[in-house]
């Protein structure tokens, strides 16, 4: 199940949806563009589409952005990287005995237990999310993460969890709302359109874009 909706504040300001993502076989991915990047929504979508074109080789692909640089769509100069490639990345991979979450930046992990109880793990970075793009920017241009960034890995055993999903930090507006129970019922039953209708109905509450891969 994949949901991607623009935040109300972006509509008010005339901005595009800066979130994107995909579901490809046993891999789910979500990216959340930085509002300071002039065209981060373009880079986010290009990254997802190009990454899917590669077959989503999460284990073997270490240099995630070279596929964009080599395609001559985006160059690797600092200004171009800042304008197009500042976005957080969340992956969740389903393996035989466990789920693996790869994170570079903030977001929310949705954990469904076998009794259908939902748990949420918020990845906080104190408003200083680490963007994978920082690995390609000379340190003199950076105020944080001058030594580069890596993905953080989290493992969840399948004998404890039925499913693991991921979401951009826009999900926080649901978790702190009066309709959280309504949302969770639809999520557990994989009712994608019901969740989209809920977000449309309460759209003014959702200041930020929201993307869910579950």
Which positions does each model-derived feature cover?
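Short hydrophobic beta-strand that contains or immediately precedes a catalytic carboxylate
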Residues: 28-32, 102-104, 165-167
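Solvent-exposed, amphipathic alpha-helical segments
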Residues: 46-57, 181-186
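PP2C/PPM family metal-dependent serine/threonine protein phosphatase catalytic domain
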Residues: 2-15, 70-80, 111-157, 197-205
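N-terminal entry segment of metal-dependent catalytic domains or homologous docking segments
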Residues: 1-53, 107, 146, 154-155, ...
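C-terminal catalytic subdomain
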Residues: 76-79, 84, 94, 141-214
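Catalytic core of PPM/PP2C metal-dependent serine/threonine phosphatase domains
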Residues: 56-112, 145-158
